[in-house]
């Protein structure tokens, strides 16, 4: 593993243990060249997923990009980081289990929205505002009004 401080490719693993999510391994590494210490995480990847964008462009699935967008939606929400990590791992497992390596971005967005809706409504609305490309306050109003349960009709 290349040292992020000096670029040396000969680093040593000093400690290795399961991460808190139990789907990855946390490794503490040491660089003998510069003395730097850093942490890496190793995860199982069942298959290489390819995202098909709405424009038709294809790009490799990037877990980090997915994680970043979810963490932005969850920012300053009272959700434990471990819960977010579990949700992200669950989304990735679900994508890998779809049986196809080519996944439309729309499918990924819908799965993320389903997961967020179960955990935090505010994060769900935040993510939806970007995913559905809200342009005005009316877009928010319409979306939020669809979330509210309707009162039963009076007879």
UniProtKB/Swiss-Prot annotation:
Boundaries of every ATP-cone domain copy: 49-139
Keyword Protein biosynthesis listed? The answer is: no
Keyword DNA-binding set for record: yes
**Keywords assigned:** ATP-binding, DNA-binding, Metal-binding, Nucleotide-binding, Repressor, Transcription, Transcription regulation, Zinc, Zinc-finger
Q: Outline the residue ranges of the record's unnamed zinc fingers.
A: 3-34
Q: Which cofactor does it need?
A: Zn(2+)
Q: Name one GO biological process term.
A: negative regulation of DNA-templated transcription
Copy out the cofactor comment. Binds 1 zinc ion.
Query: What GO molecular functions are on record for this protein?
Result: ATP binding; DNA binding; zinc ion binding
Summarizing the function annotation, the protein's role is: Negatively regulates transcription of bacterial ribonucleotide reductase nrd genes and operons by binding to NrdR-boxes.
For this chain, the family text in UniProt reads: Belongs to the NrdR family.
Q: Which NCBIfam families match?
A: transcriptional regulator NrdR (TIGR00244)
This protein is called Transcriptional repressor NrdR
Its ancestry begins with: Bacteria, Pseudomonadati, Pseudomonadota, Alphaproteobacteria, Rhodobacterales
């Amino acid at each position: 593993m290349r040292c992020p401080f000096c670029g040396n490719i000969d680093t040593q693993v000093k400690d290795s243990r399961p991460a808190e999510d139990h789907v990855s391994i946390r490794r503490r590494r040491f660089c003998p060249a510069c003395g730097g210490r850093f942490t890496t995480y190793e995860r199982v990847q069942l298959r290489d997923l390819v995202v098909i964008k709405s424009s038709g462009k294809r790009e490799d699935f990037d877990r980090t990009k997915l994680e970043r967008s979810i963490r932005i939606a969850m920012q300053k929400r009272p959700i434990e980081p471990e819960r977010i990590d579990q949700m992200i791992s669950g989304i990735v497992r679900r994508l890998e289990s779809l049986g196809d390596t080519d996944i439309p971005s729309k499918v990924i967005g819908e799965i993320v929205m389903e997961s967020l809706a179960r955990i935090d409504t505010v994060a769900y609305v935040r993510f939806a505002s970007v995913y559905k490309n809200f342009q005005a306050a009316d877009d928010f109003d319409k979306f939020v009004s669809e979330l509210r349960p309707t009162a039963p009709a009076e007879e």
